[in-house]
């Protein structure tokens, strides 16, 4: 599957790091998940075969499983309702028909464990996004409770920046910030409890929310995939280590050790790293959904 996925009968209205959006009408759009991979906010040249299909299956699983917590972007339409059969056949496993929503202008990140940028902030200040944490935590420590740590939503190619909850309130308003925080933590908590029963620890994740035409907060984009989350295996988890993950952390770790300056273009990722990444995505899907 190539990185570009032309949908000839619909107008493309947006191309993101991984997803392309096509206009259906003023209420609906088609979201197509490509095999593109981004790391450190740079889109890599090498696609990950079948990644888009696996991500779509994982997302759809979670959207359905978490539907009791809040509305989501599903319209109930099939790709066959909006595309000619020959086009729908090509992208049916990597596309969904979704509502056109007004996106909330923050990244809604929930952390249950300490790692990544959160660990760096903690080591420097003892806090993440202004939240004071207990002393003595180490890499991969389980936090006393899940925390909401928003970041700014930057344009493609720019790095998102961790912000405090007060800054989040300034950006989107206090009422909406409170709703987003409550729902994000509720979604993470239910998902993390379920994933544990399947042998997966959800270390942290990023949710995307939007408002519908009535101002209703709605879950959108992707949910709890290896692209938006860090998944660890219960079997290999140990506090004080950097646990191996089911996600693009494989590629991120390779890039971290490659000497790359994290500016585009990224170096070519070896074939064996790409294959290991595909295998990890597939393993996550199999564990969660079987």
UniProtKB/Swiss-Prot annotation:
**What UniProt keywords apply to this chain's record, in alphabetical order?**
ATP-binding, Ligase, Nucleotide-binding, Purine biosynthesis
* UniProt name for this protein: Phosphoribosylaminoimidazole-succinocarboxamide synthase
> Could you give a single Gene Ontology term from the biological process aspect?
'de novo' IMP biosynthetic process
Name the family: Belongs to the SAICAR synthetase family.
Q: Name the Gene Ontology molecular function terms of this record.
A: ATP binding; phosphoribosylaminoimidazolesuccinocarboxamide synthase activity
**Pfam families, per the entry:** SAICAR_synt
User: What domain of life does the native source organism fall in?
Assistant: Bacteria
EC annotation? 6.3.2.6
* Pathway listed: Purine metabolism; IMP biosynthesis via de novo pathway; 5-amino-1-(5-phospho-D-ribosyl)imidazole-4-carboxamide from 5-amino-1-(5-phospho-D-ribosyl)imidazole-4-carboxylate: step 1/2
What InterPro entries would the database entry show? SAICAR_synt/ADE2_N (IPR028923), SAICAR_synth (IPR001636), SAICAR_synthetase_CS (IPR018236)
Annotated catalysed reactions: 5-amino-1-(5-phospho-D-ribosyl)imidazole-4-carboxylate + L-aspartate + ATP = (2S)-2-[5-amino-1-(5-phospho-beta-D-ribosyl)imidazole-4-carboxamido]succinate + ADP + phosphate + 2 H(+)
Nucleotide-binding listed as a keyword: yes
């Amino acid at each position: 599957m190539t990185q570009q996925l032309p949908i000839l009968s619909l107008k493309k209205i947006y191309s993101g790091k991984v997803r392309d959006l096509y206009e259906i009408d003023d209420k609906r759009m088609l979201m197509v998940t490509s095999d593109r991979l981004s790391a450190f906010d740079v889109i890599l040249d090498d696609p990950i075969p079948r990644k888009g299909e696996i991500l779509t299956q994982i997302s759809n699983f979670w959207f359905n499983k978490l539907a009791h917590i809040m509305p989501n972007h599903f319209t109930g339409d099939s790709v066959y309702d909006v595309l000619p059969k020959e086009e729908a056949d090509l992208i049916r496993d990597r596309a969904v028909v979704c509502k056109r929503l007004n996106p909330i202008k923050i990244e809604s990140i929930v952390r249950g464990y300490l790692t990544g940028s959160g660990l760096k902030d903690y080591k420097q200040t003892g806090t993440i996004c202004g939240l004071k944490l207990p002393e003595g935590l180490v890499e991969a420590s389980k936090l006393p409770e899940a925390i909401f740590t928003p970041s700014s939503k930057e344009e493609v190619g720019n790095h998102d920046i961790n912000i405090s909850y007060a800054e989040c309130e300034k950006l989107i308003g206090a009422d909406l910030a409170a709703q987003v925080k409550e729902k994000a933590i509720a979604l993470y908590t239910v998902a993390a409890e379920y994933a544990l029963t399947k042998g997966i620890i959800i270390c942290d994740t990023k949710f995307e929310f939007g408002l519908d035409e009535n101002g209703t907060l709605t879950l959108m984009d992707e949910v709890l995939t290896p692209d938006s989350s860090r998944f660890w295996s219960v079997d290999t988890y140990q506090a004080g280590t950097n646990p191996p993950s089911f996600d693009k952390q494989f590629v991120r770790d390779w890039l971290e050790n490659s000497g790359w300056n994290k500016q585009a273009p990224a170096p070519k990722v070896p074939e064996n790293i790409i294959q290991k990444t595909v295998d990890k995505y597939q393993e996550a899907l199999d564990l969660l959904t079987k």
